[in-house]
């Protein structure tokens, strides 16, 4: 499976490169006489040896509104994260080596991607996925292809306010990380029926429609997109660290729907939309009409941002990841080299099947949560494959399953934007065990580095310690219950951008 999926992505990449090689005819005579791979090699050499990250210095692109608060690299983005939209008023800062080889990055249509390969050494070792509830490096003491990603993209021009513009993105990943992005109804048999270690997921496919005369610019996004809130994201380069916080691991990942984002002024941005729910395609039997409403407030000339988001508004009745979730995120820039990000959420599901029904004592099976239940004795709604039940009073067949979490990042950069350090601390309370499979409180602490070679090669080593306070939650053997309350991992990944 790994070989065939990897070959498919490689074939698509080479096909695009070969098909678009003729675009190089518009370059200089020297470029015209060079082959595609020669131009690609020169692009990487220029990226690694230029005095700035990427190509030799060029005029700063025009921007509307407050200045970008961060440097990217070494940070994932120059702007504070906001989902469901491009950053209205921000230019397209990115150049890509593949497009430099094809047409010197002279068009707004782009093909790009990356390979992310990760490793970890862990104190857990009893089962194939024994690092759970940690993600995405869930297989202990191993080296894995986390993501091979390929993007086709055109960004709308939201800097100008004169005319309508449009954009799109079609993004695919292959690798271990598909296990976290899979949506019911979108090639989901790979995970929900076959439980494949590696798989393919078209993680984003959407259109953007930019309307410049509504507020100070409005973007309407239609399709499958990353859920709106969160400091972190599913795609490897969009994160400070290799591993993800527990807070991020157990909330909503993607949605199929329509979302409108309006920039009212330099301070306020508002969002509203509808979708089929978290990780459920509209044609899936698990789809539920779901609303979202968010608002962001920026001050200190872009240095502070407060972002509130009700990301999934519906009945919250148990289904495939049908959580109702409310987020509050605060971003603060201290100076040119230090900033912090803090996120809190509360989420819940109703009428969740009780894994402890008729069982006293009730054993927590962690990532194997549903195997311990008297499933045949639980009336509708029944347990769903890939959606944990809860651990409640043994006399109840169903119950309310809430959880809450908070995470803080402290970030520092140096070495002329080539290196950054991350300190992450979080607390997560899975009150009924519905998210992780174990009803317990967790803490997680991480120190990581982010080192860039130019703007195309990233290395992210980290040391992470986590603990479950009420019962064992780590190192579960295949088909068995967790055996440890503490887990220590040394991990990292290498991202090669093209």
Regions found by a protein language model. Give the residues of each.
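Solvent-exposed loop/turn segments connecting transmembrane beta-strands
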Residues: 250-253, 277-288, 314-323, 400, ...
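Short, histidine-centered active-site or binding-site loop motifs used for metal coordination
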Residues: 274-276, 312, 346
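Outer membrane beta-barrel
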Residues: 102-123, 127, 136-279, 287-292, ...
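Domain-scale selection of a single, long terminal region
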Residues: 1-13, 173, 206
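Hydrophobic alpha-helical targeting segments used for export or membrane insertion
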Residues: 10-22, 492, 498
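Outer-membrane beta-barrel pore domains
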Residues: 26-51, 55-58, 62-63, 67-70, ...
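Acidic/histidine-rich, surface-exposed loop or edge segments in extracytoplasmic proteins
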Residues: 131
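N-terminal periplasmic/intermembrane-space "pro-region" immediately following the signal or transit peptide
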Residues: 2, 6, 16-127, 386-391
């Amino acid at each position: 499976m790994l070989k065939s999926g990897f070959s498919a992505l490689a074939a698509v990449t080479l096909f695009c490169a070969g098909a678009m090689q003729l675009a190089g005819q518009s370059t200089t005579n020297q470029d015209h006489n060079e082959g595609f791979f020669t131009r690609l090699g020169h692009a990487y050499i220029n990226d690694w040896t230029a005095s700035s990250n990427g190509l030799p210095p060029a005029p700063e692109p025009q921007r509307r509104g407050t200045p970008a608060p961060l440097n990217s690299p070494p940070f994932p983005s120059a702007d504070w994260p906001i989902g469901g939209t491009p950053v209205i008023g921000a230019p397209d800062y990115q150049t890509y080596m593949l497009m430099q080889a094809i047409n010197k990055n002279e068009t707004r249509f782009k093909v790009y991607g990356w390979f992310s390969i990760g490793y970890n050494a862990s104190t857990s070792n009893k089962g194939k996925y024994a690092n759970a509830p940690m993600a995405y490096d869930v297989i202990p003491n191993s080296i894995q292809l986390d993501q091979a990603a390929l993007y086709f993209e055109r960004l709308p021009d939201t800097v100008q306010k004169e005319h309508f513009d449009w954009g799109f993105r079609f993004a695919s990943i292959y690798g271990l990380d598909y296990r976290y992005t899979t949506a019911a109804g979108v090639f989901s048999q790979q995970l929900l029926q076959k439980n494949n270690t590696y798989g393919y997921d078209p993680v984003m496919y959407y259109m953007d429609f930019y309307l410049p005369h509504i507020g100070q610019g409005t973007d309407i996004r239609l399709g499958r997109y990353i859920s709106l809130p969160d400091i972190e994201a599913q795609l490897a380069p969009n994160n400070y660290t290799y591993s993800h916080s527990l807070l991020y691991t157990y909330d909503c990942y993607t949605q199929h729907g329509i979302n409108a984002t309006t920039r009212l002024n330099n301070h306020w941005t508002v969002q509203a939309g509808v979708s089929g729910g978290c990780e459920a395609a509209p044609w899936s039997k698990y789809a539920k009409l779901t609303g979202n409403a968010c608002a962001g407030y920026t001050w200190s000339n872009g240095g502070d941002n407060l972002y509130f988001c009700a990301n999934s508004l519906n009945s919250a009745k148990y289904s495939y990841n049908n959580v109702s979730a409310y987020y509050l995120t605060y971003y603060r820039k201290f100076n040119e080299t230090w900033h912090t990000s803090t996120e809190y959420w509360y989420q819940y599901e109703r009428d969740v099947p009780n894994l402890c029904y008729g069982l006293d004592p009730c054993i927590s099976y962690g990532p194997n949560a549903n195997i311990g239940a008297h499933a045949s004795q639980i009336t509708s709604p029944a347990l769903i494959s890939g959606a944990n039940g809860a651990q409640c009073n043994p006399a109840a067949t169903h119950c309310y399953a809430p959880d809450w979490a908070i995470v803080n990042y402290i970030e520092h950069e140096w070495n002329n934007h080539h290196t950054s350090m991350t300190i992450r601390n979080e607390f997560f309370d899975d009150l009924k065990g519905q998210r992780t499979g174990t009803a317990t409180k967790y803490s997680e602490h991480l120190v990581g580095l982010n080192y860039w070679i130019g703007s195309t090669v990233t290395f992210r080593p980290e040391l992470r310690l986590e603990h479950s306070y009420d019962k064992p939650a780590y190192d579960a053997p295949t088909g068995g219950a967790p055996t440890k309350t503490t887990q220590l991992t040394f991990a990292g990944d290498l991202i090669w951008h093209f």
